Amino acid sequence: MSPPVAGAASSGDGPPGRPPRELYTIPASSGWFQWDEIHETERRALPEFFGGAGGSGFGTASRNPRIYREYRDYIISRYREDTSRRLTFTEVRKALVGDVTLLRKLFAFLDSSGLINFSASPSRPEAQQQQRQTEAEAVVEAPVGLQVTPRPPPSYFAEEKGGGGNENGFRLPPLTSYSDVFGEWAPGMAPICGLCGMECRDGNAQILKDGFKVCSKCYANNDNKGEANIHPGDKKERIDNHSSSAWTDAETLLLLEGVLKHGDDWDLIAQHVRTKNKSECIARLIQLPFGEHMLGTVNGKLDNRLHKIQTTDGKVNKSTVKESSSQPTETVDDMQIDGNEDGADKSVEEHPTKHRRLFSSIDITVSLMEQLAHLTTSTSPDVVAAAADAAIKALGNENPQARRAFQLSEKEYQTRAFSSNHARQSDDVGGGDRDVEMHGHPDKKQGKMFISTTYQVRAAVATSIGVAAARAKMLADQEEREMELLMASIIETQLKKIQYKIKHFEELELIMDQEYATLQQMKSSLVDEWQKVLKRAFETGVPISRDEVLIKLFQNKPNL
């Protein structure tokens, strides 16, 4: 490479048999460049084409020294077609195929080294840079069809008279937010004026035709306050002083007291508070951290009171309780309570806001023996008798004295039967509840009766447990039988499917046999026709063709 020279390209003197060489100006720092070799500077600047950062080895099929030289030579040759014009990456990219990132990196390396765009006009880069800056800047202008006008001064609203300038009587102040004007009113805050954006602290608010609220001061300053501008249904809204004030401790205590007394009857709660309306009471209770929990506790107390009244009052009619194993909820209907109750108990008749289970499947007021009797009625008498015998035998094996508690002579049986009948007749004649007083029985006899009663209770409990176990065993056996039945049906269905498949395969096999027989017939007919054709050919004196060998082979081939 010739040393750098100043000025434009010139023609050099060469041998008489060679064409004149063209000289191109490059910076002195790029004197290492040679067309036939790849310098170490290029390897360090672009290690992707040389198999790593060290420059040793080869890359992939699209990244190797040969591809690099083709890219480099093309870019430099393209620039030297016209050295006065600045070469751009877009022009080079249209003719090269490869990784855009590597091509841009190679182009930047050649440009910074001065191998391209060194002799181009210096004014071109500045113009392009200025053009790029112009394109990057955002143009702020009004959309098509929209005319931007300056905002009138504040005195415009005071000086404007009549209905010509302000048709709707509503203009937003400069710093009014959307939530202040169009947002919902929050508890504890006064309404926001739509003109000045301030709170209406005086307690008066006017509703315009558009539905916005304005304070009394803005409404007085605004001349457009005729009957046509005011909403026909809401000409004036009087807001109490308590709406703009925050909740005090006394009001909160009254609210909690009203909730405890009236439950979820918000009309009565608002009357109890007196200074707040229904919506404010609801919002305040929701804002309290324990509001929902307190409301749930109140509903629970009402349910407990209902349960207590239903179980303890002697004049309560029996309620209809629908019990089902598949439906855990129960309803209590036709409940009538006699007696004088306060006004708070009237709210009990109302249905709660949520479905609650008022009673369990077994009432706690029912005696143990009644519960055991209820359990034993769910099975057959034979099972109950067997369970009772087993329980008595188990107690007898545990303690020999337990057998005496279940031994009853014929005389004692008749005595107890007579006493029970006599007591029943006396109850029918006298009526009412009578207290039975036990006199004259020694303590020893009472102790024996207590022991026998204890063993009887244990026997009853064991009987109920045995009945429950027997019922569970019966249910388990029933489920097992159902499972066996389902399994048998599944096996039968699978066997039917297999039989259908076997039948289908047999039909397919029969069809294949028929097709095979048809093919054999066609094969034999073709052989016969070929033989006839050859025979006729021999008779007419036609020379034997080479197909005769194939026919003989075909004839000698055994049938499949």
UniProtKB/Swiss-Prot annotation:
Compositional bias segments (type: Acidic residues): 331-342
Coiled-coil positions: none
Gene3D superfamilies hit by this protein: Homeodomain-like, Winged helix-like DNA-binding domain superfamily/Winged helix DNA-binding domain
Biased composition (Basic and acidic residues): 343-352, 424-445
GO cellular component, one term: nucleus
Predominant place of localization: nucleus
Biased composition (Polar residues): 311-330
Ranges where the SWIRM domain occurs: 24-127
Entry GO MF terms: DNA binding
Full protein name: SWI/SNF complex subunit SWI3A homolog
Species name: Oryza sativa subsp. japonica (Rice)
